């Protein structure tokens, strides 16, 4: 019986899950919003919230703990410099999960996970061009 066993296996080995969550956390910190399946979003939320709390601590040991989990120094510096300062007064609840319908191919429940007060300009290059074009249209 599987009583009192926390966490989902997601049909992956432990090392695959660990690597996947590290990559998803790095993507979420970089883009501040990702689209994934609902179970993956529910699993990644506490991981990233603990990383933000590490960023708010801000000391060298916290930075080393974050690097050991994410393994990307640029992402960790963004976490400690911009995201941690943004949520300095907020005690937890840094992320929101919104349901986003079902995937076409396998009918999997999809979700959007994003930072609560996220930077809307932290998206990809194509979206930045679209936002710039909209701002020029409004200014004209």
UniProtKB/Swiss-Prot annotation:
InterPro entries assigned: Ribosomal_bL17, Ribosomal_bL17_CS, Ribosomal_bL17_sf
PROSITE patterns: RIBOSOMAL_L17
NCBIfam families (alphabetical): L17
GO cellular component term of the entry, any: cytosolic large ribosomal subunit
Family recorded in the similarity comment: Belongs to the bacterial ribosomal protein bL17 family.
Assembly, per entry: Part of the 50S ribosomal subunit. Contacts protein L32.
Pfam families, alphabetized: Ribosomal_L17 (PF01196)
The gene coding this protein: rplQ
Name recorded for this polypeptide: Large ribosomal subunit protein bL17
Keyword Ribonucleoprotein: yes
UniProt key word Ribonucleoprotein: yes
GO BP terms, alphabetized: translation
